[in-house]
């Protein structure tokens, strides 16, 4: 397996955008570990695998963390109208939000813009300035 052929060459593009940071996926794995759906060994394997895959990806320059309350998350889920989200346990949403907040605290503050989405208003100019800096 030649991992070099999967890497984009420097200069191929000016901008990569991921709607999620790859390692953010470990938040779900951490939740599953807390629920005892994964053993510590399984979680450790997932972490090693995720970090290995992440090392093949372009490094993240900047993070936008969309933050909001659990009630806003629930409201957004209702607006999406996805059937499988209709019966989600409120405790699940609360615990997952706590884990995402823990993860966000590990991000480099100088490269992270935390945007409060409660109320639905945000300063687009602030976001653009952050991304262009």
Regions of interest found by a model, annotated:
Residues 1, 5, 51, 98-105:
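Surface-exposed alpha-helical segments enriched in charged/polar residues
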Residues 17, 52-61, 102-113:
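A structural motif corresponding to the C-terminal end of an alpha-helix
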Residues 74-133:
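NTP-dependent small-molecule kinase module
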